[in-house]
Amino acid sequence: LDVFRYQAIHNVIYAQFLDLLRVDPATVSFPTDIPHMPIGLFKKYRLKSGEWEPVRTFTSSGTTGIATSHHLLSNEEWYRENARCAFELQYGTLQDRPVLALLPAYLERTGSSLVFMAEDFIQRSGHPESGFFLEDLPTLSQKLAALKSGPVPPLLIGVSFALLDLAEQHAQPLGNTVIMETGGMKGRRREMTRPELHGVLSEAFEVDHIHSEYGMTELLSQAYAPKNGRFLPAPTLCARVRDITDPLSAVATGNT
């Protein structure tokens, strides 16, 4: 509630949004009553609370001619620490863990928060085999084969279509490797349900579980699903579902 009231005062666009909804911040007594800001506002405005110059701007992916979301960052180190905390809460320390990132669609553009996070994880790991892999699947496959039986389970984090490419071209048992998909076919393949995707990857790499990461430009926190698609949010993330046409109305469980 303190954060809400701060933003209601210092975020000009959010203050206008509350005014249009005729919501008096002083009357909001419970977190469940906080009005949610539509994602569309991140596309139309540069949102920030207070007066400061951004040190970095995260942008969402999008096709030519389509407006993308922008999220301004005032402190890069805060984002790094927050992302590390969310990951390490579920998986333990990044230090000495091999981190192999397969994020071709994201590496090909600027402003990706996922690439920024993965870059920090790679540096934080301090492992000589950690790094990004754009399209060099043979080298990635060789590294995974060498690391799969190591003392620390390696992390393979990748966009869905690229992991499917790896599964088709270089299927192999990956032992205790943490294989983590970040979603996204990016128009490269047909869309698949998460259970279908995980089934294909589990069979190709002979692992019991495929892990999932969820994040978005408009959020500065992540959620992770170690198994069964059940996402566990970071301490700084509280998810609530609202009606797409009414930011004050909650959506009942089981509805969309």
Residue ranges and their predicted role:
Residues 1-6, 10-13, 96-98, 105, ...:
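Active-site glycine/GP-rich loop and adjacent strand/helix microenvironment
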Residues 9-59, 67-72, 82-95:
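Active-site diphosphate/adenylate-binding microenvironment
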Residues 38-51, 76, 136-137, 189, ...:
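Solvent-exposed, flexible loop/coil residues
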Residues 62:
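N-terminal nucleotide-binding beta1-loop-alpha1 segment
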Residues 73-111, 116-126:
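Long, hydrophobic, well-ordered secondary-structure blocks that form the structural core
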